[in-house]
Amino acid sequence: MCEANAYIIKDGKEELFMQNVDKLAPDGDMLLLEDIFGEKKYFKGYIKELALVEHKVILVEN
């Protein structure tokens, strides 16, 4: 499987925000993440890093 997990940087550590992310798209001033089951979450921040081999998306809050 090629899904990624999305993490938020808090206090210098990675905190899991969403598992099995299938889609990530800008939506106004937010990011929309959708997992393989169709669950959607919105995030106010930006992408710091995409670690594709590790299947990780690193996010930072605004």
What are these model-predicted stretches?
Residues C2, A6-N62:
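Compact, glycine-rich, soluble single-domain proteins
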